[in-house]
Swiss-Prot record:
<feature type="modified residue" description="N-acetylalanine">
    <location>
        <position position="2"/>
    </location>
</feature>
<dbReference type="Pfam" id="PF09814">
    <property type="entry name" value="HECT_2"/>
</dbReference>
<dbReference type="GO" id="GO:0006513">
    <property type="term" value="P:protein monoubiquitination"/>
</dbReference>
<dbReference type="GO" id="GO:0030332">
    <property type="term" value="F:cyclin binding"/>
</dbReference>
<keyword id="KW-0808">Transferase</keyword>
<dbReference type="GO" id="GO:0005829">
    <property type="term" value="C:cytosol"/>
</dbReference>
<dbReference type="GO" id="GO:0061630">
    <property type="term" value="F:ubiquitin protein ligase activity"/>
</dbReference>
<keyword id="KW-0832">Ubl conjugation</keyword>
<dbReference type="InterPro" id="IPR019193">
    <property type="entry name" value="UBQ-conj_enz_E2-bd_prot"/>
</dbReference>
<dbReference type="GO" id="GO:0043161">
    <property type="term" value="P:proteasome-mediated ubiquitin-dependent protein catabolic process"/>
</dbReference>
<dbReference type="GO" id="GO:0051865">
    <property type="term" value="P:protein autoubiquitination"/>
</dbReference>
<dbReference type="GO" id="GO:0000209">
    <property type="term" value="P:protein polyubiquitination"/>
</dbReference>
<dbReference type="GO" id="GO:0044390">
    <property type="term" value="F:ubiquitin-like protein conjugating enzyme binding"/>
</dbReference>
<feature type="region of interest" description="Interaction with UBE2C">
    <location>
        <begin position="214"/>
        <end position="236"/>
    </location>
</feature>
<keyword id="KW-0963">Cytoplasm</keyword>
<feature type="binding site">
    <location>
        <position position="144"/>
    </location>
    <ligand>
        <name>Zn(2+)</name>
    </ligand>
</feature>
<keyword id="KW-0479">Metal-binding</keyword>
Length: 370
């Protein structure tokens, strides 16, 4: 095939379950030249008068060139075509908390923004997942006798850590000089960022987007803030979709205000997006904050539709979602909710134009570690 391009943006998405691939060859910013494109089972080859560029597919991914179909040109976006594809299955998601922390380990809690130690050298004898936020109501529905857990909240003991959907609960009695009051904010001493809040005089809730938990012998990992927030939220969504078959979520602040509506489309995508230019391959902005690997790498992705709910936008839709028991709320600090909205907007702007919206929703395509 031949198209007129000056600098071609290549976007490839492989759906593992559907065994299909979408290939988008973008339009040049300005000018143009003849470009011949060949699709082989393991690579994309682009030839121009100035040279030849080959983009190799990652191991385990194969295309079927003879299955090319749905060829169309979309103005402002480029050439689209669909093919049959095969990709190895991705590993099952593992709790990101348990990847780096196991019971019996001595660990420390750090402020993710500045690296300040919040809890130092805490030996955790039990690391336990919490039930869903509505577990008490479910007990009342299913039990034929009075609820034995009524008015008995779950509080961790001194060497416990309870893991919720978007937070950790730890016993803070031994780390504080004076007994704290319930329902007060926990602020980082160095950068003054809100890390969590006290649930009771002995229990502190730390939000997963604000702290990093590391074994004490390890060092503080310096991860860019936007990359960290994206990965935490993406991991939470994948785990909840897998465990509870829940696909719609609200992102709300600790004050109960809804900031974002999320609707998970799929988490089985493999995305590859280099930018080719006269014999070289380099990263495209969608990957710059997400990966440290080379530009030829592919990444597991979760695709999520979202709607902002700030400044009274989508007020009726947000209200209807809040009243729907199939919609799961995720609570974060209000400042992080606004930060996440900016991250989603920037991510959306880096996608091919035709993929940025679906009906009235916008698309977020995030790197998802497994």
């Amino acid at each position: 095939m031949a198209v007129v391009e000056a600098e071609t943006r290549v976007f490839l998405e492989v759906r593992r379950r559907l065994q299909s691939a979408l290939l988008i060859l973008g339009e040049p910013d300005e000018g143009g030249m003849n470009l011949d494109i060949s699709v082989t089972p393991t690579s994309l080859l682009m030839r121009s008068p100035d040279g030849c560029t080959e983009i190799r597919l990652p191991a385990g991914v194969r295309l079927a060139p003879s299955s090319c179909g749905g060829l169309q040109y979309i103005s402002g976006d480029g050439l689209h075509l669909r093919l049959r594809a095969q990709a190895e299955s991705s590993p099952q998601p593992i709790s990101g908390f348990n990847q780096s922390l196991q019971a019996q380990e001595c660990c420390s809690f750090y402020c993710q923004s500045c690296g300040e130690v919040t809890i130092k050298d805490r030996k955790l004898l039990r690391v336990l997942p919490l039930p869903s936020e509505n577990w008490s109501a479910l007990v009342g529905e299913w039990c034929c006798h009075p609820d034995p857990f009524a008015n008995k909240p779950l509080h961790p003991r001194e060497n416990d850590c309870f893991v919720g959907d978007s937070f950790f609960l730890v016993n803070s009695r031994s780390d504080l000089e004076q007994e704290p009051k319930a329902n007060t904010k926990v602020i980082c001493k160095r950068c003054k960022v809100m890390l969590g809040e006290t649930v009771s005089s002995e229990t502190t809730k730390f939000y997963m987007t604000e702290v990093i938990v590391q074994p004490s012998e390890g060092s503080f990992p310096n991860i860019p803030r936007s990359q960290f927030v994206q990965s935490v939220i993406a991991r939470c969504l994948v785990e909840l979709c897998t465990a509870r078959s829940t696909f719609r979520f609200t992102i709300q602040g600790q004050d109960g205000k809804v900031y974002i509506l999320l609707w998970v489309l799929n988490s089985d995508s493999l995305v590859m997006e280099p930018l080719s230019s006269s014999g070289c391959i380099r990263k495209f902005p969608l990957l710059e904050d997400s990966l440290e690997a080379d530009s030829g790498s592919a990444w597991n992705a979760i695709k999520v539709l979202y709607q902002p709910c700030i400044k009274s936008r989508n007020k009726e839709l947000a209200s209807s979602w809040e009243g729907d028991i199939s919609v799961h709320p995720l609570t974060l600090p209000s400042t992080t909710c606004l930060e996440l909205l900016l991250i989603l907007s920037r991510n959306n702007a880096s996608l091919p134009l035709s993929l940025r919206q679906m009906n009235s929703f916008q698309l977020w395509c995030s790197h998802c570690k497994t």
